Amino acid sequence: MKERKVIIKTGLNLENSYTSLPEIFFTRQSPSRVPSPKLAVLNYSLITSLGLNAQVLQSADGVEILAGNKTPEEAIPISQAYAGHQFGHFTMLGDGRAILLGEHITPQGERFDIQLKGSGKTPYSRGGDGKAALGPMLREYIISEAMNALGIPTTRSLAVVTTGESIMRETELSGAILTRVAASHIRVGTFEYVSRWGTVEELRALANYTLQRHFKKGYDKENPYLFLLQEVIEKQAELIAKWQLVGFVHGVMNTDNMTISGETIDYGPCAFMDVYDPETVFSSIDIYGRYAYGNQPNIATWNLARFAETLLPLLHINPNEAIKIAENAVSDFTKLYKNNWLSGMRAKLGIFNEELEDEYLIEDLLSIMHKYGADYTNTFRALTFDNIEDTVLGGKVEFDKWYKLWQERLTRQEEAKLSSKQLMKSSNPSVIPRNHRVEEALEAAVKEGDYSVMEKLLDALSKPYDHSKEQDYYSKLPEPSTCPYQTYCGT
């Protein structure tokens, strides 16, 4: 398809460094034309931080670019190749419905991928139509922006446009395209792909590119590829800990959904936990609970082991030594994760200093919460504002005993009680994207064309630590239901 190159002053300052890699990593591919694109939602705060022109992006020409009907002059549209272990099984994948326009360089010199998701068939579509539905694209917009506000590394959503076409899934749905912004789209699955089907030199090219883009300090190290492995492990330890601290269940932790940059990616079957339960699963296809909330750290370790395997030819000339180096690096994940998680949990309880018994104090609280079906987010909110009596834990003897131990623990630090409260307020969100509130917003937008419900939700989610009365509506639990909430891989 001939590219429709245009000069439109959107503020996009595109480079195409990924195309400097060997051609095994991508295929030149233009977005498919759509009949009647209309702007559904535009992320003005992200536009500002990227140095883009909001007025132009929301104009007719800007919408044509966001829909893929027109291509910025500097863009070299590509779809990226990658593989992945999906539910433990290796398979060839790739961008089946996404086109990378290029890398936007911000006025501050930062580099971000600009990708159109739902932009048509690619060589990696595997029989799919390459399209996306409006509901799942809006859902990714909501959740990714909520994650960003919570301080969790994530891809961002710049815009969603409707395409004016219908797509067939179980039923007929409105088509849409999401503009995703990411530090990069390099995945563990990208390395798995070249490890399986490429040469060692192509693997080295990808590793060098990744070092240059994300870990430049690695060039000065004795073993830069070990440094790469260690940095990815550290970033994932930090990321997974942050997920656990807010009760986020990703739902599809396949290796193609683990980024090298340490950002959360792919918001298909994800959801936030209400009642605390380590076995919480939302994805309709995760029937054995592989990606359950409590198993996410273990899956991260497994994924990182797959990443380490791809780097073996680069880690050492002796295969046995390479394996030892990789195993030692991956074995560090558990400690790194636990340190990050414990640090975050201490903050949620207003604890500044470290004591060996802290882990037992934390685990005892979680055990009590699990036993009585306490809401994860609202329990910590209640502890922050001293109104635990309003929760299911109020009046429970076990909790009262724990509470006394916690209060005693707070006396064993120099910081004043007021400082502890401030720490808790900045560590315990009052509002998360509750599943029923997200569905409420999506139903209004998709079925009725009313985006006001979504806009109000996004406003509340943008200030999770403000603890204002206006947020109370979004912190309320769903009505008791006999049907557990389920998610699907729509995004």
Curated annotation (Swiss-Prot):
Binding locations of Mg(2+): 257, 266
Binding site for ATP: 94, 96-97, 117, 129-130, 180, 187, 266
EC number: 2.7.7.-, 2.7.7.108
Gene Ontology MF, one: AMPylase activity
Xref: InterPro entries: SelO
Keywords of this entry: ATP-binding, Magnesium, Manganese, Metal-binding, Nucleotide-binding, Nucleotidyltransferase, Transferase
List of catalytic residues: 256
One Pfam family it belongs to: SelO
Listed cofactors: Mg(2+); Mn(2+)
Catalyzed reactions per annotation: L-seryl-[protein] + ATP = 3-O-(5'-adenylyl)-L-seryl-[protein] + diphosphate; L-threonyl-[protein] + ATP = 3-O-(5'-adenylyl)-L-threonyl-[protein] + diphosphate; L-tyrosyl-[protein] + ATP = O-(5'-adenylyl)-L-tyrosyl-[protein] + diphosphate; L-histidyl-[protein] + UTP = N(tele)-(5'-uridylyl)-L-histidyl-[protein] + diphosphate
Family of this protein: Belongs to the SELO family.
Function: Nucleotidyltransferase involved in the post-translational modification of proteins. It can catalyze the addition of adenosine monophosphate (AMP) or uridine monophosphate (UMP) to a protein, resulting in modifications known as AMPylation and UMPylation.
NCBIfam families, per the entry: PRK00029.1 (NF000658)
Name of the featured protein: Protein nucleotidyltransferase YdiU
Phylogenetic placement of the source organism: Bacteria, Bacillati, Bacillota, Clostridia, Eubacteriales
